[in-house]
A protein has these predicted regions:
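Conserved short alpha-helical segments that host acidic/polar catalytic motifs at enzyme active sites
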Residues: 1-248
Length: 248
């Protein structure tokens, strides 16, 4: 998560791609743990309505990290050939390069079981038209009560289209994210705020710790999970029984 404006990193490090370079380096640090796939997601802050602000690239190639960053490199080479001056224009890059933003999430898949199709590769996205209801998630976990967690989703009235562990975790967090949004919406609606104003206030007051605490209360096992919401709040969750390697 870049804590300063994009122009700061261009000025200090001489490159507009400090965030992407760091993500690449951190993913390479886990290169030796085995790869059955890899994926990255990025978030652009402050985008105007109608512009995509979450992007994702996933690969199940033999060298997935290489393929992911080769795709980005190909885009950059085309920009360099056509508009070389744009490589130092952070505003232009943010509006024209999908993977360019202020927040990055990367994951390496080590498939102990399950299929290694692109659909099984993290990060996973739970999309919504409200920024504060968007959820992007990646992680490694070994929870022993997945069947119970899935049944709890059904008891809530949901009808999940998949039974995978990751989708169950995604929807579990998503349920409490939706609840938090509803509570805050009612609060600010009573104060007479417009819907636009309410969306801004929800982003300021969303209680991330409460959402994650409620979601993880019934998890049994080890896990490390990282993610972010569409308005920019990000998190890392580490279970008490976890020894999984991660970098932030």
């Amino acid at each position: 998560r870049l804590l300063k404006p994009l122009e700061f990193y261009l000025s200090k490090y001489g490159t507009a791609f400090y965030g992407l370079n760091r993500l690449h380096l951190l993913m390479q640090k886990q290169h030796n743990r085995g790869q059955d796939g890899a994926g990255i997601a990025s978030l652009k802050l402050g985008m105007e309505p109608g512009r995509r602000y979450i992007s994702r690239i996933r690969s199940n190639a033999d060298s997935p990290i290489k393929e992911i960053f080769s795709k980005i490199g190909t885009e950059l080479k085309e920009i360099e050939e056509k508009y070389p001056q744009r490589l130092t224009d952070t505003d232009w890059l943010k509006n024209n390069l999908d993977s360019y933003g202020e927040l990055y999430l990367g994951h390496l898949r080590y498939g102990t079981y399950g299929k290694n199709t692109l659909l099984n590769i993290h990060p996973f996205i739970r999309e919504n038209n409200w920024k504060t209801r968007n959820l992007v998630l990646a992680g490694n976990f070994n929870l022993t009560n997945m069947d119970e967690l899935f049944e709890r989703l059904i008891d809530l009235g949901q009808d999940p289209v998949e039974t995978s562990d990751t989708v169950t975790i995604l929807e579990k967090i998503g349920h409490f994210l939706d609840e938090e949004n509803e509570v805050l919406f009612r609060k600010f609606n009573k104060q007479g705020l417009s819907n636009r104003e309410i969306s801004t206030e929800i982003a300021k007051h969303l209680d991330v710790a409460r959402i994650l605490g409620q979601a993880a209360k019934t998890w049994d096992g080890g896990y490390v999970i990282a993610g972010f919401f569409g308005h920019g709040d990000s998190f890392v969750m580490l279970g008490f029984e976890s020894i999984t390697q991660h970098f932030g």
